[in-house]
Amino acid sequence: MDYKNLVAERIKENTELEVDLIEKLIEIPPKKEMGDYAFPCFQLAKTFRKAPNLIAEELKEKINKEGFEKVVTVGPYLNFFVDKTILIKDVLEKVLSEKEKYGSSKVGEGKNVVVEYSSPNIAKPFHIGHLFTTAIGNALYKILSFEGYNCIGINHLGDWGTQFGKLISAYRRWVDEEALEKDAIGELLRIYVKFHEEAEKDPELEKEARLNFKRLEEGSEEETELWNRFKDLSLKEFNKVYDMLGIKFDSLAGESFYSDKMDAVVQEIDDKGLLVDSNGAKVVMLDEYNMPPCMIKKSDGATIYATRDLAAAIYRKKTYDFHKCIYVVGTPQALHFKQVFTTLKLMGHDWADDCKHVGFGLVKLANKKLSTRNGDVVFLEDLLNQSVEETLKIINEKNPNLKNKEDVAKKLGIGAVVFTYLKNNRERDIVFDWKEILSFDGETGPYVEYSYARGKSILRKAGELTGEADYSKLSSKEEFELAKLLGGFNDAIMNAIDKLEPAMVTRYIIEVAKAFNKFYNAHGILNAEDNDVKLARVKLVEATCQVIKNALNLLGIDVVEEM
């Protein structure tokens, strides 16, 4: 039973408000002893022409209380206490019947959502900052898909621009082919850095690089062959990380894909009378929106990111007819996306309102114990490998005889890192601290994983239990609070979709793990006072494990069955 919906239906019977609006107004009381749901009666003051306190009292007398233990007033609020026995039975039966589908819905059926995320630059390090966009985008993709949306995951590769002219010059002069085969990104980065050092002494190198890129734009066979090699080598390295994270994309259409589509966009902007000359550059003026101009073409005629993003948005709308187009890109790019979306609106594309920028913070290291390949950039692959190694050390200390401990360390280590990136509001910076990330105490991935493994251990020991569970035996505060939390899984998911914030699911699952451990510590399960209580509690454990597994899967994290 959806109690929030039931509260809304009961209020609707006695007011003129619609259920959808009532559900949005319903709150969770700040203290558990105040009830399970609260409805603020302020919204009804105009209609009823009474003070909210009096309206609450009046509704309390009229409302159908079936399914609730009691309904009380707290000032202007109408507070509902659910019938604990009915709630526990409803929630556990629903979880155990729907299993891996529990928490899902068809709310997004028939709606396409484009999610652009990860988007590393070709020939540049796939560093620890990239995991923010990668983890958030992957989680949003999974969460939206779980609720019925048809998602298109796009890795908008940074595979075009004048930097490739520089890289071609650097490759021809200084590449070490042996080093390139061993560590492609490291070698490409080395020669790219060397190009900039040498260009300071010899400005002719910059001219040569521009000529190289011009040839690439014109389709020169030699330059195109080198560009493809850089791309193939980079993707081979990137795919190692994506394989570790279990991530696949529906499209790898990066910046180069739109190189032949930008002239049409520039022409469309010009045809609308929006293109203005500014010191030789072509811009769209956005003064009335309190924004600087959106540059479309530089003074040398080259297009820039904004032009490519405009072309990409128009192409995606034509190709996917999206309900939403989500850009998971760092918060510093907020102004850029405001300019792009506003320019789209000025071009007459009202669907620009369906384009959403999902920003995120920075990643900082608590100490310098993380090794780097070139002294300043921390490669993501190295970070994930180090997390697995550190986790294996912990397992060897705590449970050296654990079966498949390398596999467990891999799942736990990688999952711990992803969990850290998704734990807090995405716009907050992350301070990376191994001690905290890999701790089995506190609000961490390993803590949640350990809670799941503890539950699975109980289920293995319980074996096959026969008979129908009598959920009225679950009468304690800890049992009710846990079951009630399990019933709120879909609410957490819908909040994550509404705010485009995976942390809503992460925070939820931390609360579930805490509630489960409180229940575990307060009550005997396998040694319960009788078989009826034992069966009911085992079913509660089974439902908890199912919800934790479903939630972690939405975050892109594998569960560990034993540790």
UniProtKB/Swiss-Prot annotation:
Taken from the record, one Pfam family name reads tRNA-synt_1d
- What EC number is given for this enzyme? 6.1.1.19
Keyword match Metal-binding: no
Annotated GO biological processes are: arginyl-tRNA aminoacylation
Q: Which UniProt keywords apply?
A: Aminoacyl-tRNA synthetase, ATP-binding, Cytoplasm, Ligase, Nucleotide-binding, Protein biosynthesis
Q: Where is this motif: 'HIGH' region?
A: 120-130
Q: Which domain of life is it from?
A: Bacteria
The text of the family note is: Belongs to the class-I aminoacyl-tRNA synthetase family.
Q: Spell out the subunit comment.
A: Monomer.
Task: Name it.
Answer: Arginine--tRNA ligase
- Origin species, per record, is Clostridium botulinum (strain Kyoto / Type A2)
Gene name, Swiss-Prot/TrEMBL: argS
